[in-house]
Swiss-Prot record:
Residues 1-24, 526-545 are annotated as: Disordered. ADP binds at G42, G94, T95, T96, S97, T162, K163, G411, G482, E483, E497, K502. It is an enzyme of class 3 (hydrolase). GO terms for cellular component: cell body; chaperonin-containing T-complex; microtubule; zona pellucida receptor complex. Belongs to the TCP-1 chaperonin family. The modification N6-acetyllysine is found at K222. The modification Phosphothreonine is found at T430, T459. The modification Phosphotyrosine is found at Y247. The gene is Cct3. This is T-complex protein 1 subunit gamma.
Amino acid sequence: MMGHRPVLVLSQNTKRESGRKVQSGNINAAKTIADIIRTCLGPKSMMKMLLDPMGGIVMTNDGNAILREIQVQHPAAKSMIEISRTQDEEVGDGTTSVIILAGEMLSVAEHFLEQQMHPTVVISAYRMALDDMVSTLKKISTPVDVNNRDMMLNIINSSITTKVISRWSSLACNIALDAVKTVQFEENGRKEIDIKKYARVEKIPGGIIEDSCVLRGVMINKDVTHPRMRRYIKNPRIVLLDSSLEYKKGESQTDIEITREEDFTRILQMEEEYIQQLCEDIIQLKPDVVITEKGISDLAQHYLMRANVTAIRRVRKTDNNRIARACGARIVSRPEELREDDVGTGAGLLEIKKIGDEYFTFITDCKDPKACTILLRGASKEILSEVERNLQDAMQVCRNVLLDPQLVPGGGASEMAVAHALTEKSKAMTGVEQWPYRAVAQALEVIPRTLIQNCGASTIRLLTSLRAKHTQENCETWGVNGETGTLVDMKELGIWEPLAVKLQTYKTAVETAVLLLRIDDIVSGHKKKGDDQNRQTGAPDAGQE
């Protein structure tokens, strides 16, 4: 008996699962995540209401926003959530479809694993299918003229129709297009569109959504420092600083020993002279506005006010950069180094308005702003947050088209066209790999199928007729009308998606499926007993599933 004792290699606290059990566990986890998100696809999508740990409410149908709030335990589910974030950062749209596709790719693979097919065979078939998917997409894509405003609005509209903001779609499309066109920047033949940095969304509760607009310039939530300063200036000369207009304390807070009273008065006098000198350096350039990221002392305010200069202090660094881009000023670190060409003269108007209880500074009517602020008004914070998320998506879509002006038909049409191409190609294939290859084509149909399901139409009947349609010549633009659940030509309906978004969606979905199929072992460590006691109140540990 002694020889048959089991040998313990792993520590007793660890739990190990391997083989088929792990694979089916991963596939189920991915399917669960995909099922949560499935109803959020298309124009007839449902909303999800999430309570975050702080008790705040998030209402959204944006795939990435939902998954960000969900807390999961299974490692495979975590990687699914990660891909939606990647998609959001990379192209800003398609977060819902990428999760649904990845879930479906894994779901169709389960059948082959049950038949004892080796995961590597499935993976290589998936890889081949991905290459063919990419080439088919490029074949059916059409170039677009980015200067054609109506066409651009149409593209953005297709992305917006699935969101809450679709009720105000023409307003939202115009806002997104204007904002992106404003921050577009070409240098040495290289296009740069940085929405995150230079197109800021400011949400102010109150008013109605129709009051929202794009400002040709910048808005900041600040008031002037001194009540007697001007609040309405036409064609202002703007000076931007990132140093404070206060007396410099010694860097190491040096102590000074004073023996006579005159010394103390002299020190105070020096402080005043220093501040006066700073202000004179600035006033020499005859600016109308001084904006600084740091503080302004009372004395400096007094000097500036006497020179009829408006001062604004403690502005965020990002806002300062935006003001610099909008009015053509340079941010200066030392007032004594100010020169004439550091002054921004590109703004047409500086105005300080009171909205609700707060004061806002508007720097608008800029001649050639390379930064802008989108001002959103609306009934409540929740609605504003959702509208902001939707606008971000719309701006990303617009940015993708400007950077890569290629389009593919929306509404599940490109998925069906690619699926049809894969099915045709699989007929010429021999060997075991043809089955998983064909399954990829099957998995792609999940997008039109979900669109049909979400608007409550008959899935089987419509999918069959859509398949039949795609076997005919020149019918690759036929898809599902998400509003009514009927089959239509997307060209006529005007529903297009940027090629960049589609390519990223397919690549990410297949890569994730491949990654999760590769896993055949999960070793999870237990928490130590002490940690266990501390966390009794929280959720159970990952090791104790």
